[in-house]
Amino acid sequence: MKGSRTAVALSILIVTFFVSVCARGADAPSLDDLRRKGVVGERYDGVLVVRTESADSAVRSLVDSVNAKRREIYESGAKKQGVGAQEVGKVYALELSKKAPAGTWFLGEDGKWVQKK
């Protein structure tokens, strides 16, 4: 029973995150474009990472901003559910892998990059 409550709560948290990201307007399309181009990728723990050394300061700033917002959400969800923020991040990463555009790169726990088709 506790597991199902945690799953429901984490699902609500994930939906809240997606709504907050989509509400940001101009950042969302540029983030998807950066994902498709392989400039940024998603890590197994729900952290956005820069994949290319040539990424400019605007890209790095966007990544920092997205990760700061994600950290807040992960920590808030973790506190409410009595779980670790990393657990929340991993659940988010699984959902993100389903919703991210084709071409997005994902870094697995094994250190290997895989591109979404």
Show the residue positions of the predicted features.
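A short, ordered amphipathic alpha-helix with a cationic face
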Residues: 18-21, 62-65
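Amphipathic, charged alpha-helical segments and their helix-to-coil junctions
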Residues: 26-61, 81, 85-117
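Generic intrinsically disordered, low-complexity segments enriched for polar/acidic and small residues
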Residues: 14-15, 71, 89
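Bacterial N-terminal signal peptides that target proteins for export
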Residues: 1-10
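Bacterial N-terminal signal peptides
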Residues: 9-20
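Short, well-ordered alpha-helical segments
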Residues: 63-78
